[in-house]
Amino acid sequence: LSLSLDRRSVKLGERRQDLPENPKRFQADYCVLGAEGFTSGRHYWEVEIGGRRGWALGAARETAGRKERSPGSHQKREIWCLGTNGKKYQALTATEQTCLAPNERPRRFGVYLDYERGQLGFYNAESMSHIHTFNASFRERIFP
């Protein structure tokens, strides 16, 4: 993944970058965390996926496993995301997959975190129609 200079966008590069080892870098997946994490309050951000066919977006705990080789190797529910392989939409955690059938195929998503209520909701940012909400007990810093 290539991060823009202003650190506001990311895209899939043509080839893998040769970067020094960093314990905060995800090894097995195409993942990047936002610079700011949240430990309280209500927060909203938007993610534009454009016309991409395969993508995933969401949030993760600060301690989300970054060196595991497969999502199934996680012991805790540390990542919550919405994604598609171009054919079907899914709500995903490290241990669960829920198939979704949205009426729309948004190009821009809204993500709403209510830390105290333990909710992470996904919306079509253009129509504000609800897509899916995860309920969890966060108990640590959450990153977009």
Question: Where are the regions a protein language model picked out?
Answer:
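Beta-rich ligand-recognition domains in immune and ubiquitin systems
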Residues: 1-144
